[in-house]
Structure formats: C-alpha cells, structure tokens
A protein has these predicted regions:
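DUTPase catalytic domain/fold
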Residues: 1-168
Length: 168
C-alpha cells in the first residue's frame, strides 16, 4: 500500500511559481491526478491539422516499485477539443524519473489548434502491476467461463453475429 505519490515540480525559471501544485486530483476519490501543459512564460503552442507535438508537464514523478503510471487523456479532451494523446495511453515505469511529457495530436483536418500553459489535458493513474513471468504452452487449459474466444462485442448483439468481415 502506497501512502502518497512523490513528485517534483520542475518549472524553475518560468513565471509559474515553483510552489504551484502541478499534480493534483480534483477530488480525493478520483482515480487520476490531473496533468497540465507546462509552457514557459505562459506561452501557447500551435498544433496544425493532423500534426502532433510533444509538450511537457513540468512534473517528474517517482512511481513506486510494483506500480505503473498510466497516462490517459482527460474526458474533456475528447468532448471539448480535437486533441488526443497520440499513443492513447502512455506508460511510466517505476524506473523513469524524467519529466512527464505528452504527445498530443490535433485530429482536426482543417483547423490549427492551440494548447495553452496550464491546460489540463491528461491524467496520471497509478496502478499495481503483475510481476510474474510468462510461460509458453502449446494449448490453454479449458476454461470454466462461458466467454471462451468471444470478444469485440460478442455478447448481447446476436442480430449482428456473423455479419462482420474480419481481416486476419
């Protein structure tokens, strides 16, 4: 059990005070810590249509051993902007202690879009990891579960069953 996430604000030399809380949850019960765009002197960065850019957050984190940090776009990113995290989910292993950076893509095919300093665009969720090894077998043991090989919405959609062409 981990008591708190250790982080360092690395925004020295900018107009943002070093004491600004750059990693926080909006509510104590939230799963993720909000991450803000850090741009020196409150500048903006233009991202053209279909373009992607890496932006810093001004934060370094110390992910505890046995855990991983997962970076997700905030839900408002998808509902209010054409931005998305280019890799969909970022992974921060416990050994990485550099600045947390985000690769942001403008999904608009027409408009330039701007990110501003302190825009909250991502969240960091820290979860335990499975630390076991991997064992190769020639066949999986039979499962007591009904699902079997069903996937991709195979439950609850009997009308559409067998109407999807799969490319394998």
């Amino acid at each position: 059990m981990v008591g708190s996430l250790i982080y360092q604000s690395i925004v020295e030399g900018a107009r943002v005070p070093h004491e600004v809380d750059r990693l926080k949850k909006a509510h104590n019960t939230d799963a993720g810590y909000d991450l803000q765009v850090f741009l020196p002197d409150h500048l903006t960065v233009k991202i053209g249509p279909g373009e992607k850019k890496m932006v810093g957050t001004g934060v370094r984190v110390q992910i505890p051993e046995g855990y991983v940090g997962l970076l997700f776009g905030r839900s408002s990113l998808a509902t209010k902007t054409p931005f998305q995290l280019a890799n969909c989910v970022g992974v921060i292993d416990c050994g990485y202690t550099g600045e947390v950076k985000l690769v942001v893509r403008n999904t608009s095919n027409k408009e330039d879009m701007w990110l501003s300093a302190d825009d909250r665009i991502a969240q960091l969720v820290v979860v335990p990891i499975f630390s076991g090894g991997a064992t190769r077998v020639s066949e999986l043991a039979s499962s007591e579960h009904e699902r079997g090989e069903g996937g991709f919405g195979s439950t609850g959609y009997t009308v559409l069953k067998n109407q999807v062409d799969l490319v394998v």
